[in-house]
Design a protein with these regions (language model features):
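The structured alpha-helical core of multi-pass membrane proteins
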Residues: 2-666
Length: 666
């Protein structure tokens, strides 16, 4: 047996000034554009806007950023990394072998709601930025401009954003500095706003306000980007994120304080629709501020789109989502492009912009589903802490604190349901349904595999190879196997080799692709089962590694030739004389489902739905990067196995009866 790494990549995210600046452009776009609409939403949420109300609301923002973003995500969640990678699916992959089976539900609910809320992010950030132009021209066509920006943004994804991406960090540094400076300039309008650092003002406001749920729904918008912060752990590293967050948090709080002070000082003459963010800008830099807000909105949207590609790629490898075509527009590690996801997100963003028309209407839809994501992350984090043998009292305290806090935010955001929140929840529900069906259908299909011991067939496979009366199908036949055990083989593969039509070849290779719980694993091992005849290759891929099986397989064969474990020479003397190599044919066993009554009702429903969803997936030959001219697909029925050990009981046995006419003949 031999074991090798196909490639080895060591990525270290050392703390550095450049690393911190790059992190600003990758991680904090979403949370960094929240000042565009949070205070405006808070003003709209209150029946009576006065100093006490604004101080309490800003206090809610400060302590939400402290408890939810800083404590939960920056201090705790970032420690739960999967070989340096973060995000809810990476967290699930880290704990799934040690947790309860139903935990996959937490992962698919969390991932679905994260993507659903992400449809709103580009729309609301771009609209909020462009609406600032109405300070110059009240009749500015905001929606058409926003649609143009979103269209260009999604269009350029296919070419990669590596070139302009290098500017994101410095531009976001300018943006956050602008936030801090503008806030500091306006705090002087009402110095008592600094009382907002006292959490008692937040408690007092929520306890005395009948519309507390509306207030919290608006406040929650300040931390919607926290989940993205965790998801981008693998791009930047924990130290760079934590260091840059200290700067980002200070700038955000200064800006919220400045907006709060301005609102209090102008509380008597607030006009409907006024955005405090633009109101605190000196008129001379307003155009610059709008330009920077638009750039920040584009950067935030770009980060979300890239993050969506990553989430779907992980979901495919975790068997949550049908395999889709993946492209790599640049050589940058981890930068990928999924056409189906890109066009789907684009269409949904356009629909959202046309449906809501402005950022005020969109605020009602924003934030609801992300609270569900955060709740799911909390539950998975508690499982992680338990696995890491954290003190039980600490895990319990963590659960009580954050399930309690996020449940309050969820209840508060439910007030948005009828005002637009249903949009993201509907989208999330569709995605949850697809993921649930795909995962369970895959599990059902794998459960029907009949396993045989390959050693029992050594002699007949060797005899088929030597039997020259059987036409040779190929020099090398590669069977894709779902089983990873050294001597395990599917009955259907044996049937293909021996029974269906004897598949004579010089070499038979069983290739098993094993998706790992780690993100970047790329390695293989080989076993020679019958010398110069039968081989097994186990290819292990991390959940963030694209399965370019054709390329990896070629590398493996080249390694085996160098190690003298395999020969590429043709068995035909005339071809071997001219050094013509033998050909390879991949054989894929495609098991077709039929709605047998002996499936349980649940399984029948899942498999029937699976048949429809299956039409969305990329063909297995394209998803694995195989040369279609060298692929044979054999369709076989999906035979249902018994839930007991007795396979014969799975299908009702036909009872033999006596033929009455035959009796009369006798």
């Amino acid at each position: 047996m031999s074991k090798n790494n196909i490639s080895h990549t060591s990525v270290r995210h050392k703390l550095s000034l450049i690393g911190v600046i790059v992190t600003l452009g990758i991680v904090f776009g979403d949370i960094g554009t929240s000042p565009l609409y949070v205070m405006k939403a808070i003003v709209r949420a209150g029946d009576t806007v006065n100093a006490e109300y604004i101080i309490g609301a800003v206090s809610c923002i400060i302590w939400t950023l402290t408890l939810q973003t800083t404590v939960k995500y920056v201090l705790i969640a970032l420690r739960a990394d999967n070989k340096g990678e973060g995000g809810i699916l990476a967290l699930y992959a880290l704990i799934r072998r040690h947790s309860k089976k139903w935990y996959y539900l937490l992962a698919i609910i969390g991932a679905s709601t994260l993507i659903a809320d992400g449809v709103i992010t580009p729309s609301i950030t771009v609209l909020s930025a462009i609406e600032g132009l109405r300070a110059y021209e009240p009749e500015t066509p905001v929606v058409p401009i926003a649609l143009c920006i979103v269209t260009v943004l999604f269009f350029i994804q296919q070419f990669g954003t590596n070139a302009i991406g290098k500017l994101f960090g410095p531009l976001m540094l300018i943006w956050f500095t602008l936030l801090g400076v503008l806030g500091t300039m306006n705090i002087g309008e009402y110095f008592p706003i600094l009382q907002a650092f006292n959490p008692l003002y937040a408690v007092r406001l929520l306890a005395s306000s009948p519309e507390w749920f509306l207030i919290l729904g608006a406040v929650f918008l300040c931390t919607t980007g926290a989940e993205a912060l965790y998801s981008d752990l693998g791009h930047c590293g924990i130290n760079n994120i934590r260091t840059s967050w200290a700067f980002v948090k200070i700038m955000l709080i200064l800006n919220y304080l400045g907006q709060g002070a301005w609102i209090i000082s102008h509380v008597g003459n607030l006009t409907p629709g006024v955005n405090p963010f633009y109101a605190i800008m000196p008129h001379g830099i307003l155009f610059f501020g709008i330009t920077m807000a638009t750039i920040a909105a584009i950067i935030a949207s770009q980060a979300l789109i890239s993050g969506s590609f990553t989430i779907f790629s992980e979901a495919m490898n975790l068997k949550f989502w049908p395999r889709q075509k993946i492209k790599y527009p640049t050589d940058v590690k981890g930068q990928l492009y999924i056409p189906f996801v890109n066009i789907s997100l684009y269409v949904l963003c356009v629909i959202v912009i046309l449906f809501f028309q402005n950022s005020e209407n969109m605020e009602a839809a924003y934030g609801l589903s992300i609270t569900v994501t955060m709740l799911m992350t909390t539950l998975l984090l508690s499982a992680y802490l338990t696995i890491k043998r954290t003190h039980r009292w600490a895990v319990t305290l963590f659960l009580i604190a954050f399930v309690g806090l996020e449940s309050i935010f969820f209840v508060a955001n439910m007030a948005k349901f009828m005002h637009g929140g249903w949009v993201t929840m509907l989208l999330a529900s569709v995605m949850i349904g697809i993921m649930y069906i795909w995962y369970n259908a895959t599990t059902i299909r794998n459960a029907q595999i009949i396993v045989r011991d390959i050693r029992d067939s050594y002699s007949i496979i060797s005899d088929i190879k030597a039997d020259e009366s059987i036409p040779k199908y190929a020099t090398n036949i590669v069977y894709l196997s779902k089983l990873g055990g050294t001597y395990e083989i599917e009955q259907k593969i044996l049937y293909s080799i021996i029974n269906k039509h004897p598949m004579r070849a010089d070499h038979y290779i069983l290739l098993h692709i094993d998706y790992q719980d780690t993100p970047s694993t790329l390695e293989y091992d080989t076993v020679t089962l019958i010398p110069d005849t039968l081989y097994r290759i186990n290819l292990r891929l991390g959940f963030r590694v694209h399965p370019l099986v054709n390329r990896y397989f070629r590398q493996i064969i080249e390694d085996m030739v160098v190690q003298k474990e395999f020969s590429l020479a043709s068995a035909y003397p005339s071809l071997a004389k001219h050094k013509v190599m033998g050909n390879f044919v991949f054989v894929l066993i495609n098991r077709l489902y039929a709605a047998y009554s002996y499936f349980s009702f649940r399984d029948r429903m899942i498999m029937n739905a699976y048949e429809w969803i299956d039409k969305l997936k990329l063909s297995i030959t394209r998803s694995l990067g195989l040369d279609t001219s060298n692929v044979l697909i054999e369709n076989v029925p999906l035979v249902v196995r018994s839930r007991t050990s007795n396979h014969a009981n799975a299908i009702p046995r036909v009872e033999r009866v006596e033929n009455e006419e035959e009796e009369n003949v006798k």
